[in-house]
From Swiss-Prot:
Disulfide bond annotation, renumbered to this chain: none
UniProt topological domain (Cytoplasmic) ranges: 1-71, 159-170, 225-246, 323-379, 457-691
GO cellular component: cell periphery; monoatomic ion channel complex; plasma membrane
Protein name from the UniProt record: Outward-rectifier potassium channel TOK1
GO molecular function ontology, one term from the record: potassium channel activity
Keyword Transmembrane: yes
Highest taxon of the lineage: Eukaryota
Main location, first listed in the record: membrane
Membrane-crossing segments per the record: 72-92, 138-158, 171-191, 204-224, 247-266, 302-322, 380-400, 436-456
InterPro entries: 2pore_dom_K_chnl, K_chnl_dom
Gene Ontology terms describing biological process: intracellular potassium ion homeostasis; potassium ion transmembrane transport
Annotated stretches, region: Disordered: 504-550
Length: 691
């Protein structure tokens, strides 16, 4: 990771030292391995590149693994996704655990008769089942498990809000959820073996206890794996989440409180048990509407409207934030991994072979790697989403088959309708096991359907955009010139050629370089610090103004009055420097204007090879030490290439050239100050001569 950070800190257009890494970075990386307590590396990307990245660089820089390796992806998923999963499961487990405490676990089989809610005109949807009081030990264990689970959730929320340190939080959470899940699991096993004779049936409370125990233990396993990653030195002691992403814990807790309040309220309004009321709240919140439990009274109907409207908004917010973390924030990082993996292989093959690549060939190869990575990313994301969806669909149907004693086809039919939130009502879970499982299954499966539709929509949009481009390229340029005219001339040119800088721009630049070179040769007669033309055909400006001022100070007389021959030489050099800077500034402003227009029109626009070459040439005009910023023909596939990152390319180029503009303006200000000094000394010299 140290080598990655060093290259990560200087990713610009090949201008090696535009971003520096502090000397302590490598030492800290070594210390992190030896002490098993990784510290965040201090390497900092160039500001221009950081602004153009499609992900936050600190999310990658804390992972102590090579970006091209599979372990990088694994530990990134552990550091980022696992806390999000825990934040979603923990509060839900607490919500369900309340039901397993409130509900009795056993009932007499003869009284477990469910009536059709449409056959009468009452609010009672289930005959009062004759439940059996649980042994005192079971109730006591349930209470202790609930308290431990609730405490663990509070601690996790404090850590998400950065009110508690990682080590303290992990110690309490892992211990608390392990004990809570273990006690509940033992309770369930003992009750099944010793306190469940044949005349009793398991109620919804018993099945909620089974689910709560499983969720507690899953949270324990997830946090334990995250803690192991920290102990192995793969990332620092923190959750790899941005500040706005940490708020997801607060929203999931709020949703759990909303479900707890709704279940308690509808239990009284509809005269049903707390567990069945929780099932009703889930059906209403997810807009499935199975119709097996209906509000009859006016008060119940009003509260359903209030509860459902606010609950749907809250659920939609959680789904949006979760998808944003998993796909939008982390998607560019997975793309970076795929590109870096392909680039590393190509770079290794290039270094091992004797084949020479031209700069254009290296650029085309890197573009091909990026396109392949993007295509694989889309299909992999779609495949994983569909696989998870199929698992929820088919495995969920399998559970309902045994819980409700339906045929497997009818279970598939029921699950698919629920995933689409259709809810005809011809099938609905009636048993305690079916309804308990439906609560946890629906809370995970129905929002997943929204993620699938969004993923498929993004993929279809990308495919349609690609087809539009191919169809557009088949048209003749004359047809395009009819569509794009007047003010759209620049955009028309970009659509026709795929380049934002015309040949005239490059020609003007070459002409300017030739003119500057000619003027520099003339000025060399007056000043030893003349400009030199480098191998790339770019003319460097004259010596720095600080050096000119220093030479003028040394040449002056003790009275501080310059001889006229020195004044003439410095004045000519200063005038040429100002002319050179103004012309370069004009070219930079022209390029920046085009790039700014592209940034506003299309953030996904990719620059062509000639565009990058022209931008590189513009940048080098303001570099004094040209040799320090020279690059080989293989630059585009080297570790220093900026194209290995998911970039907003026009914005990156815009920021690079804008920095040059700032430097040029600074040079012009220095020119003006130095010109005043020269004019003053020239006046004093002429005045002395007349005397």
């Amino acid at each position: 990771m140290t080598r990655f950070m060093n290259s990560f800190a200087k990713q610009t257009l090949g201008y090696g030292n535009m971003a520096t890494v502090e000397q302590e970075s490598s030492a800290q990386a070594v210390d992190s391995h030896s002490n098993n307590t990784p510290k965040q590396a201090k390497g900092v990307l160039a500001e221009e590149l950081k602004d153009a990245l499609r992900f936050r660089d600190e999310r990658v820089s804390i992972i102590n693994a090579e970006p091209s390796s599979t372990l990088f992806v694994f530990w990134f998923v552990v550091s980022c996704y696992f806390p999000v999963i825990t934040a979603c499961l923990g509060p839900v487990a607490n919500t369900i655990s309340i039901a397993c405490v409130v509900e009795k676990w056993r009932s007499l089989k003869n009284n477990s008769v469910v009536t059709n809610p449409r056959s009468n005109d009452t609010d009672v949807l289930m005959n009062q089942v004759k439940t059996v009081f649980d042994p005192p030990g079971i109730f006591a264990v349930n209470i202790i498990s609930l308290v431990l689970g609730f405490t663990s959730n509070i601690i996790l929320m404090l850590h998400f809000s950065k009110k508690l340190t990682y080590l303290k939080s992990q110690l309490i959470n892992i211990t608390g959820w392990t004990i809570a899940g273990g006690m509940l699991l033992v309770d369930v096993i003992v009750c099944s073996l010793n306190d469940m004779p044949s005349i009793y049936s398991k109620t919804i409370g018993f099945w909620f206890a089974c689910i709560s125990s499983g969720l507690y233990l899953v949270c324990t396993i997830i946090l334990t794996i995250h803690f192991i990653g920290y102990k192995l030195g793969k990332y620092p002691p923190t959750f790899n989440l941005l500040p706005n992403e940490r708020s997801i814990m607060a929203y999931t807790v709020l949703l759990s409180l909303w479900l707890i309040w709704g279940a308690g309220m509808f239990s009284g309004l509809l005269h049903i048990t707390y567990g069945n009321a929780l099932y009703f709240c889930t059906v209403s919140l997810l807009t499935v509407g199975l119709g097996d439990i209906l509000p009859k009274s006016v008060g119940a109907k009003i509260m359903v409207l209030i509860f459902s409207l606010s609950g749907v908004v809250l659920m939609g917010l959680i789904v949006f934030m979760t998808r944003s973390i998993i796909q939008k924030s982390s998607g560019p990082i997975f793309f970076f991994h795929r590109v870096e993996k392909g680039r590393s292989k190509s770079w290794k093959h290039y270094m091992d072979s004797s084949k020479n690549l031209s700069e254009r060939e290296a650029f085309d190869l890197m573009k091909c790697i990026r396109q392949t990575a993007s295509r694989k990313q889309h299909w992999f994301s779609l495949s994983v989403t569909i696989a998870i969806f199929m698992a929820f669909w088919l495995l969920g149907a399998l559970v309902f088959k045994f819980a409700e004693n339906w045929s497997y086809f009818n279970c598939i039919y029921f699950c698919f309708l629920c995933l689409l939130t259709i809810g005809y009502g011809d099938y609905a879970p009636r048993t305690g096991a079916g309804r308990a499982f439906f609560v946890i299954w629906a809370l995970g499966a129905v929002p997943l359907m929204g993620a699938i539709l969004s993923t498929v929509g993004d993929l279809l949009f990308d495919i349609s955009t690609s087809l539009d481009i191919k169809i557009g390229e088949s048209f003749n340029n004359k047809v395009k010139s009819i569509v794009f005219n007047g003010r759209q001339r620049a955009l028309s040119f970009m659509v026709n050629t795929g380049e934002i800088f015309e040949e005239s721009d490059t020609a003007d630049g070459d002409l300017e370089e030739n003119t500057t070179s000619s003027q520099s040769s003339q000025i060399s007669e007056f000043n030893d610090n003349n400009s030199e033309e480098n191998d790339s055909g770019v003319t460097s400006p004259p010596a720095s103004l600080q050096e000119s001022f220093s030479s003028l100070s040394k040449a002056s007389s003790p009275e501080g009055i310059l001889p006229l021959e020195y004044v003439s030489s410095a004045e000519y050099a200063l005038q040429d420097s100002g002319t050179c800077n103004l012309r370069n500034l004009q070219e930079l402003l022209k390029a920046v204007k085009k790039l700014h227009r592209i940034c506003l029109a299309d953030k996904d626009y990719t620059l062509s090879f000639s565009d990058w070459s022209y931008i590189h040439k513009l940048h080098l005009r303001n570099i004094t030490d040209i040799e320090e910023y020279t690059r080989g023909p293989e630059f585009w596939i080297s570790p220093d290439t900026p194209l290995k990152f998911p970039l907003n390319e026009p914005h990156f180029a815009f920021m690079m050239l804008f920095k040059n503009i700032e430097e040029l303006v600074g040079n012009l200000v220095e020119d003006e100050e130095l010109y005043k000094v020269i004019s003053k000394r020239k006046f004093l010299g002429e005045h002395r001569k007349t005397l």
